[in-house]
From Swiss-Prot:
InterPro entries reported in the protein's UniProt record: Membr_insert_effic_factor_YidD
GO cellular component: a single term: plasma membrane
Protein's cellular compartments: Cell inner membrane
Keyword Cell membrane: yes
Membrane topology annotation: Peripheral membrane protein
Pfam families, alphabetized: YidD
Primary subcellular site in the record, as a coarse category: membrane
Protein name stated in the entry: Putative membrane protein insertion efficiency factor
UniProtKB keywords: Cell inner membrane, Cell membrane, Membrane
Keyword check for Lyase: no
HAMAP family assigned to the protein according to its UniProt record, in alphabetical order: UPF0161_YidD (MF_00386)
Transmembrane segments: none
Amino acid sequence: MAPPLSPGSRVLIALIRVYQRLISPLLGPHCRFTPTCSSYGIEALRRFGVIKGSWLTVKRVLKCHPLHPGGHPPVPPGPFDTREH
C-alpha cells in the first residue's frame, strides 16, 4: 500500500488534472508515449512523492519531442509497490 500523498503531491496532481481537462483537449492527442506524460506524472507522484515524482515527470516531458521515438516506458516500481514486474 502506498503512503498517503503529501500536500505538495496533491497540488501537483491537481494541476495535472486541470491540464488534462482544460488544456489537453484543445491541443489534441500528440503525446509520443503510452501512458501519456500527464498520466505518467500522476502515477510517479503517487508512487514516489513530490521530489522524485516531479523529477521523473520532468525527465519524461523533456523526452516528448519529434526527435524521440516515444514508446511505452512505465513508471518504475516504487518502494511500496508489491506487484510483480
